[in-house]
């Protein structure tokens, strides 16, 4: 999967490592005026995906999040719409 400025790859991170990384990424993305970003968490057991999505649903900069389209990782990634 191609890495771009609008995505963060959490492969290999624990939940405790991933959440602060996602928070920094969201703030940087918001400052860069991005409105749609992707969080790549992998398919695996779903532990990281669940923790990240739970965090995203409560984050003040997140308007909406959902499973990414197949070309952006499908169930292994989450598409995030940032607030205006």
Where are the regions a protein language model picked out?
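Long, charged, low-complexity intrinsically disordered regions
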Residues: 1-84
């Amino acid at each position: 999967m191609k890495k771009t400025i609008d995505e963060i790859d959490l492969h290999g991170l624990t939940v405790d490592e991933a959440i602060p990384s996602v928070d920094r990424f969201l703030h940087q993305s918001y400052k860069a005026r991005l409105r749609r970003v992707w969080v790549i968490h992998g398919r695996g057991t779903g532990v990281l995906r669940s923790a990240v999505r739970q965090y995203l649903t409560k984050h003040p900069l997140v308007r909406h999040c959902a499973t990414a389209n197949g070309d952006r990782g499908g169930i292994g990634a989450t598409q995030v719409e940032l607030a205006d």
